[in-house]
């Protein structure tokens, strides 16, 4: 793949915490329009890499570019404005706000008024707020949680909270959706529904970059996969090829990939 094909380009990234090397010389490219999976044993550096990509951490070496623009070192809100949205392994909803309000908060990233303007609520802002609500309801419908629009986020089932978090991320109209273990805690029925939703998001034009411990889900969903182990990339390619890679099998001790 040429550099011109990459929407997200992680270039020789390193991240250290004291004497611990969490990421070492990691390079990968995510193409526009694909679902790209990042897997590896616990402690491999997957979430650290997500944190570097989304601006929570600055890399100690290397760089991250998105759409041809260097974004490493930018704050998370600036990276969100570039078109990267993220969900977290531990769901981070506003528990005492409704599902609709949660998505509206996400939508404010893409408005002229922003969150502060929504509080001040001038005439123009009120009209914009009505448009934001309509759009937020569309994202709730898209993600299958429209019926819970007026319910507090904390009252939703775990699966619906995951869907709500995705709806809020989509409300920013990202070019890249970064999902940190989106299937965590889901039962088989919820995982199947999630897979359908993620495929639909990809088919509608977004690019997905996900961490997931459910290797079976990753192998069936992703177009390409990278594998981290002890902070280093040990494999990258199509799921079928990665699954047969001796280094990957050794890292997982044959268990999850058997």
Language-model features, listed with the residues they occupy:
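Glycine-rich phosphate-binding loops of nucleotide-dependent enzymes
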Residues: 2-258
